[in-house]
């Protein structure tokens, strides 16, 4: 087996099953291998079967302390052999961000459970994918891990949609991401939150870092503590109460109202100037061009972003220990950039850990 395939198959961490019975009780029925009580409680909370509003969310995903979770939920048809179950959720935990891959695999596992009514077949398929990267079954469809490239998952969102909603204000999101600030996104529908938040890391494509994404967070003490341990993040919420938690964000996006708010404490670092205006115009121009694909828009933004780092390069020098490049603040000040540009470059150097300690 190719080394890349071996690496790919080692990404899954576990599989679990949650059921809602005819009495309306929701139970954690089975998992492989075992899981912690904390993670089990988190997954029960994320699974829509425990939700009081009784809305069915076919697929949700998110991250908790570097573990990604993917949950597919279905209603059990009357014809199924699962007579005492009205709904069930299949949960997969993994080390990687790839919603399309795990949505496809959980759908196959759902079909297996509907047909056999026992987790045994699911476990066999899970182990097959874990060890070989493939599971094949005539009636339930086959799944091949390597069909789902991580890069494809990174490109699956739509920057064009974000720009059509926020226009020039998209540059606020770009600036916040460049400076590794904390972005909180609210919308009452989890699907809208997930679609929007998963796209944001693509605005800073040079980092290709989706570990900053926490697309489904509850206002739960343990989850918030885990979130606040991260330096910068993109966090999605469906509870408007999060707007009253300024300790959680530098930038607040109310998707439902199409509003972006910069928190008072972040205003100094996020002050906008000529550089930001140019960046905003480029983002809007590129995204509104019907000839350009999503990946082309990302490329345009990445090239302009590289220019910003090129601006920073002349003011950096090798640190005393020779380990990394650090900012020469005097050289930056002597250049006499407009205040907003100098301020941004300084904060960018801080975000890139280029300040002298």
From Swiss-Prot:
Keyword entries, A-Z: Endosome, Guanine-nucleotide releasing factor
Keyword rRNA-binding: no
GO molecular function, one term: guanyl-nucleotide exchange factor activity
Residue ranges of domain cDENN in the record: 165-299
UniProt KW Protease keyword: no
Source superkingdom: Eukaryota
GO CC, alphabetical: late endosome
Gene Ontology biological process terms from the UniProt entry: endosome transport via multivesicular body sorting pathway; protein transport; regulation of early endosome to late endosome transport
UniProt feature coiled coil, ranges: none
Domain uDENN: 1-140
Localization per record: Late endosome
Domain dDENN positions: 301-357
Subunit structure as annotated in this protein's UniProt entry: Interacts with the coiled-coil heterodimer of CCDC22 and CCDC93; the interaction is direct. Interacts with RAB27A and RAB27B (GDP-bound forms preferentially).
Function: Guanine nucleotide exchange factor (GEF) regulating homeostasis of late endocytic pathway, including endosomal positioning, maturation and secretion, possibly through activating Rab proteins such as RAB27A and RAB27B. Promotes the exchange of GDP to GTP, converting inactive GDP-bound RAB27A and RAB27B into their active GTP-bound form.
Similarity annotation: Belongs to the DENND10 family.
UniProt-recorded name of the protein: DENN domain-containing protein 10
Organism expressing this protein natively: Homo sapiens
Source lineage: Eukaryota, Metazoa, Chordata, Craniata, Vertebrata
């Amino acid at each position: 087996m190719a080394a890349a395939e071996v690496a790919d198959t080692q990404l899954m961490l576990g599989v679990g099953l949650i059921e809602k019975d005819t009495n309306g009780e929701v139970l954690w029925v089975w998992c492989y291998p075992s899981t912690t009580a904390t993670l089990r409680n988190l997954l029960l909370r994320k699974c829509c079967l425990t939700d009081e509003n009784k809305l069915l969310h076919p697929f949700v995903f998110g991250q908790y302390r570097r573990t990604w979770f993917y949950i597919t939920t279905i209603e059990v048809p009357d014809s199924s052999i699962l007579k005492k179950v009205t709904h069930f959720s299949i949960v997969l935990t993994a080390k990687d961000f790839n919603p399309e891959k795990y949505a496809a695999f959980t759908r196959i596992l759902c079909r297996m459970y509907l047909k056999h009514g026992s987790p045994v077949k699911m476990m066999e398929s899970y182990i097959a994918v874990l060890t070989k990267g493939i599971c094949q079954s005539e009636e339930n469809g086959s799944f091949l891990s390597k069909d789902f490239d991580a890069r494809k998952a990174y490109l699956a969102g739509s920057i064009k949609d974000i720009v059509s909603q926020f226009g020039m204000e998209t540059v606020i999101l770009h600036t916040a991401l460049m400076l590794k600030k904390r972005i909180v996104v609210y919308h009452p529908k989890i699907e809208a939150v997930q679609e929007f938040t998963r796209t944001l890391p693509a605005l800073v494509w040079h980092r290709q870092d989706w570990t900053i994404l926490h697309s489904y967070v509850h206002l739960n003490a343990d989850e918030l503590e885990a979130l606040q341990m991260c330096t910068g993040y993109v966090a999605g919420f469906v509870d408007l109460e999060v707007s009253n938690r300024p300790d959680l964000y530098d930038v607040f996006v109310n998707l439902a109202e199409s509003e972006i708010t910069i928190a008072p404490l972040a205003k100094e670092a996020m002050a906008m100037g000529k550089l930001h205006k140019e960046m905003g115009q480029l983002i809007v121009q590129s995204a509104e061009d019907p000839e350009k694909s999503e990946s082309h828009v990302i490329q345009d933004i990445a090239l302009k972003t590289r220019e910003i780092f090129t601006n920073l390069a002349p003011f950096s020098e090798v640190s005393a220990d020779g380990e990394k490049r650090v900012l020469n603040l005097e050289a930056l000040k002597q250049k006499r950039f407009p205040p907003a540009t100098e301020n941004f470059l300084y904060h960018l150097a801080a975000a890139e850990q280029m300040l002298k300690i």
